[in-house]
Amino acid sequence: MTNYIRFFHIKMDHFTFLEIETWVTLAMLLFFVLFPTKCLAFFPNRGFRRFAQQRVRACLVVFLLSFFGRVALLPIEPFTVPNIHDEFSYLLASDTFTHGRLTNPTPALWHHFEGFYVLMQPTFQSKYGAAQPLFMALGQRLTGTPRVGILLSMALAAASLCWMLQAYLPAEWALLGALLAVVRISWFSYFGNSYWGGSVAILGGCLVLGAAARLARKSEPHDGLWMALGLLLLANSRPFEGALISLPICFYTVWVLFRKRARLGIWLPGTAALFAGAVCTGYYCHRVTGHFTFPWTTYWQQWSICPPFVFGKPNHSVHYQFADQLIYNRDYETLPYVAAQTPMGFFVEMVVKAIYQWLFFVFPALSLALIGWIPTLRARKSRVLLYTLAFACFGFVCETWLQAHYVAVASGIVYLILLNGLRWMRVSARQHVVWLKLLRGTLASIVCMFFVRLFVVPGNTFPPDWASQTADIPGYRDITRIMEGKPGKHLVIVRYRPDHFWGYSWINNGYDLQTQHVIWARDTEPLESNVPLVCAFPDRHVWLLIPPERGFMPPADRTAPWDADAASRFLQPYPSTACYLGSAARW
């Protein structure tokens, strides 16, 4: 259990939140069970059904509610600064695309700029796929901030979920499922509140699943285009997990079209779009890695010891120059891999992975709805999705690490099961009214938890979500703000303490070092002199930063940012004579 219940995932304060939702859910269920049935006018009602029948308008409302609803919550739940290695990697790709580049040349003295999840050779670029950074770049280009791109992708994901569910459920239940996703995922999960990913995977998965159902029923050419777009989004966001969902669905769709003897006009648009997208993807990969391989595979070959799958072999050919890289890749990242090498350890890891997904997608409020796997299996048109999820789960448990944004590709299937469970309660109420009470108690608990999360649970947990808490780099927001506010150009050499925690990354730069206001570089002394680095940027003010670590107590008054005096404990001018002394020594 210690492999997943640790710093990046659940943490003790979220056990408290788990207890809160458990008690709220039990209280709501008990209240509605004991209350007279005639007073339970909650859901569904005729007005909601009538509006949901306008399917395009329903999807549009979900999109607008996801986007502008999150904006309206900013005074209470503000966006937080990036803190995770993955986020900085995505931001690098977004910055690159915003400035019209596919990748960047390797900077001189590149060892000083090594970061996690970033390729330095043969080019300087993120290891992740291009789908999410493209959305972020769109937001950055149009509004100046990639946050808008995240909001846009999350709103599209919620709307696509509504569109997908409309192909399998009555319109009112599809709309209800999308609204649940808006509250649980768009507004209060790290999918919509960080740069860590998840929204594009939901979008791609829902497009594939929704288009497959429509192709099986009507076989319209535009549905093939939607499916091709979804496949490309999955390939460029979560390629392995996307393949687990896409392969069974694609085989099923092709089989149905052959049985129906679909004309060429049905196949051609989607096939052509898929081929064009594959060519573009291959070209991007070749520009980044020099080969037709995904950047993440090249990154693993260069930087990772732990294999991505529990049955793989470790990569012992990697050499690390810095201690934080070694500690992370050798000690931390390999923990679940080592644990899964025994049958009992593999079983424990599988259970822990399942618990984590339950914490994110279901939680106590929707646990009763998991009974929906039975009607999903019985329904002819949705049975294939349950088989697809079962197939994907075999692949999920074989991955060394499994987080919620990995499983996001299957969010549409998960919500279909949950909605089928709620719908089954509504239908079963004809025989036993207690099911109607449980249905309305479940929905009421979600409404109550919205207000609990908004006003009761502290808003300083990053990211604000139902399941996990991630790193909060001590002093990062304030020190970076101080440096960005200084006039002129600056070079900050970061010297980590011996007790440095690898999760606190300060070496985060943009697409072009020369044009940056502040460059963040690693201190390589005593193994390698910093003199060449200082001499490479003669027009910059050079600083030495020894950042705070875990256990650091921030200033008492957190309503005001640090001033220069508060930061001076960690940030000092670098000896200005170092470059000249180094030059004299060479002579």
Predicted regions and their residues:
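Hydrophobic/aromatic-rich transmembrane helices and adjacent perimembrane loops
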Residues: Y90-L91, G198, S237, A243, ...
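Perimembrane helix-loop-helix junctions
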Residues: H222, A243-Y283
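Transmembrane-helix signature of polytopic, membrane-embedded enzymes
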Residues: L60-V62, L161-I185, S199-L203, R217-W226, ...
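Transmembrane-helix motifs of polytopic, lipid-linked glycan transferases
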Residues: T145-L169, C206-A211, I371
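Signature aromatic-anchored transmembrane alpha helix within multi-pass, membrane-resident enzymes
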Residues: A58-L64, S246, C250, T271-F275, ...
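Catalytic lumenal/periplasmic loop and adjoining terminal transmembrane helix
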Residues: H286, R423-A584
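Short helix- or helix-capping micro-motifs
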Residues: S66, A174-I185, G210, M227, ...
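Hydrophobic, aromatic-rich transmembrane alpha-helices
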Residues: L156-A159, C250-K260, Q341-L386, F391-C393
